[in-house]
Amino acid sequence: MKLPFFLASRFVAGETLDESLPVIDELNRDGLHVALDKLGEHVHDREEALAARDIYIDLVRTLAGRDGTEGLHNRISIKLSMMGQMIDEDFCEDNLRQLLEVAAEHDLFVRLDMEGSDLTQSTLNIFEAVYPDFPNHVGPVLQAMLKRTDRDIDRMCELGVSVRLCKGAYAEPASIAYQDMTHIRERYLDYTERLLRHTDDSGIATHDDRLIEATKTFADRHDIGADEFEFQMLYGLRRTTQREMAQDGYNMLVYVPYGTEWFPYFSRRLREKKENVWFVLRSLIKG
């Protein structure tokens, strides 16, 4: 049974691009950068992968052509598993290159989402294959909960790559991922400090006040300007905080997903915070 979209509307901008564009425009008017993501994952058919590539190319052109975005750095966020990663890495890399050629033409950045741990190495392999040709227009996501991220951070700092750092929302076994949130926060802050020291324009993707304040303090103590990195949050969460931080002079990016395949993303948001579950329950009661 397909659940009604209104349940996810707090976290997903719309089921179509046209439904999502007014959301993007409103965020931009408030001085917030946007990363637009077409929801979907794990494509196993070549024609579907090619169609996903073409959708991403259209997203680049759509965002690049929006009015009122002067001084903002809108971008798209993509999943390589939608472009054939699980079919053939070379096929996926070719699709990504075609997308990045268009992105470079429009000077628009493409963020490579990090999915489950089974795709981590493949994602980084493909990233490193294309990065030398598009150093200003592509960067990966790293998850603080994964034990391997320590060495991945070192590698990205060596390259000077823009990284989106998040805690990680996928269920992973204790053999490869930290399970204790206190430990994950400690790793997150360590990785944040290394990224701020050695990369430009990395994204500190967190809603955690302790991590936000610690990041601000570290940047101040080391004379790292607010224009040298950005905070990132998800659409529908901490909306007042997003605007307040932008007003305080910080770069604030909002990750804005859309599409009909919203249920996996919606489920991950519910697992993350009990407040999200209460929001959905209230919506059901009101409905």
Task: Indicate residue ranges for each PLM-predicted region.
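Positively charged, amphipathic and often flexible ligand-engagement surfaces
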Residues: 1-287
